[in-house]
């Protein structure tokens, strides 16, 4: 069945995978709502992955394919160029069958903040798919595509992957070019693969990673993501932050699955130890000063002059104000206000300056722990997916990224791999490693995937979407 196929499965099939993908989208996407744009006409591409259908989050530019960022501001914007990661996928023959839904400008944790519609969780259509890469996660989990790209600023690849029961990988900052990724918070943003297996995530990393002259933050480091992926975890040492157990909102069933994962690690020959990471409790507050500050600067370009929405008013200032008020949704406006406030002369040092210092302290703490351990383990999210419309308080919403944010603030690689269920919805295990230790992080995730008691015939189960 196409919906269960991985990239490796596709390599041994002669069938028309693109049409199978488009038929699957046509059949179920009216219910799941993964896609903002579906691409029916494909380019003639050659390469080792020719014809394997993949989806792209709709804040990553695609030449001659609409790129909306889930916003009214860019609803009709069609870029004249491909993002570097998209160009590299095309060079290897991958077929882009659509652009996936997201929280507006990638600001959110549920895809409820899209200006167009809410993406639904394939495991239960009454629940969110997570965010901000919820469309990509749902498209992969429901079998509409074999794999997808997402972007991760504070957990936006890993959290929806956990909610939808798939693999989501955030690489080390600088490994994957951000050229063509519409900027939210430039020092935090990173593009990553969302797949049905850890090996597929490694395969995509082999394609998209690498130095790019169009992005000065990329590095020249050449990593081998596949050779050691089956090495296992025997003899490794894993750290578990004590702060995980002190978090009162940690769901009991999520905690139980996490304990099972730790026992699995020990059975496979790894040693698990608790450690103190005192600055981790400041991660969310630090993030919600730095990220909105960068967003307020990055989103200043959307003024109705060069491209995007323009609401004409008699005066230029009125045109700016009306355009931004209509074009941006409530959550985006909230973060712009917050960021502009923290960057103001009167409050810069008290908020933004202090947050940057705490960011450095947190990064130092994580690197100190990782000097003695192979990886840090946490749940990906403190809870499974929640019902659509059930969370209204912004603070509750922001705290859902409490375990994922530290990897972005420190630039470290981190992956979410499925590990069981809570309340009949998927749970993710997060593995965070040293900078540029991405291959080891993938190998650790592969061991958990391979030996998970929740595997079925060696595969992580996927949902049966009932329409």
Curated annotation (Swiss-Prot):
PROSITE patterns xrefs: AMIDASES
Its EC number(s): 6.3.5.7
Active site: 57 (charge relay system), 132 (charge relay system), 156 (acyl-ester intermediate)
Annotated family: Belongs to the amidase family. GatA subfamily.
A Pfam entry, by short name: Amidase
The UniProt record lists the keyword Ligase: yes
Keywords, alphabetical: ATP-binding, Ligase, Nucleotide-binding, Protein biosynthesis
Assembly notes: Heterotrimer of A, B and C subunits.
Known function: Allows the formation of correctly charged Gln-tRNA(Gln) through the transamidation of misacylated Glu-tRNA(Gln) in organisms which lack glutaminyl-tRNA synthetase. The reaction takes place in the presence of glutamine and ATP through an activated gamma-phospho-Glu-tRNA(Gln).
GO-annotated molecular function: ATP binding; glutaminyl-tRNA synthase (glutamine-hydrolyzing) activity
Catalyzed reactions: L-glutamyl-tRNA(Gln) + L-glutamine + ATP + H2O = L-glutaminyl-tRNA(Gln) + L-glutamate + ADP + phosphate + H(+)
Protein name per its UniProtKB record: Glutamyl-tRNA(Gln) amidotransferase subunit A
Gene: gatA
One annotated Gene Ontology cellular component of this protein: glutamyl-tRNA(Gln) amidotransferase complex
